[in-house]
Amino acid sequence: MNSKIVQTSKEIPTYLATCCTNKSKHSPYEMYGCSILVTKQQNGHIDLNDLMQQLGKIGIDSLFVEGGGTLNWSLLQENLVNHIQCYIGNKVLGGQSAKTAILGTGFDTPNDSPAFKLSNIMCFDEDILLEYDIIT
């Protein structure tokens, strides 16, 4: 409840998605002004297609997702990605146990993977932003 997102939800519309149907867990967030979207469950997680349907019904037709590798994989797997932003910085990170941008099982072959076309390159001092749009 201490996060800035929750604290400002009366001024800035804030939607929280969950597959938890226990309304007593929702009410503290609702008291701060958050709107709760209860989705179907898929493999113990939010059903992303159901969430997208609910967001569309309230007029939200695009999202900027800064997710971890698991969420990124789930969105790709469900064909819910049409644009990717990839930032490259001037520092080298990594290691054998480092998380990657896309986790999950991955695609078996390049033909199974969605294809993206480079649409923009921007430089910010020592960093680069690559933007890709899905090829349909």
Where are the language model's segments positioned?
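Enzymes that bind and transform nitrogen-containing heteroaromatic metabolites
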Residues: 1-136
